[in-house]
């Protein structure tokens, strides 16, 4: 992992409403997705970039789901090799993974990357009629995070 294969730190902005279904509907907003569950794990700092794999494995174990049941995966690519590692270790088909570009191609705006990933996941489920998406990223010093979202579009 070097600066040559890392995502650029870029500017970015975005907004997303997050709330309970009841509060959203009360205010005339129809939810497009719901957060089902999430996990955070740690790996040795020397394995920075590996965190998404155990985070996704733990999330799947918690929810009782399997890779084939997930319609879309959005994995932040702070470094290009992270996505290749996740695909290889978990057997994620390329046609269900980071279809809209990631940190290397569109940039990595601090504080907005997670929102961009969530918006990609929600939009993919909405457009394809898929049910589940997993969003995942590695965090500094060997951490990994994964979140499962479910399509709520009618």
Label each PLM-derived region with a short phrase.
Residues 1-154:
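Claisen-condensing/thiolase-fold acyl-transfer catalytic domains that form or cleave C-C bonds
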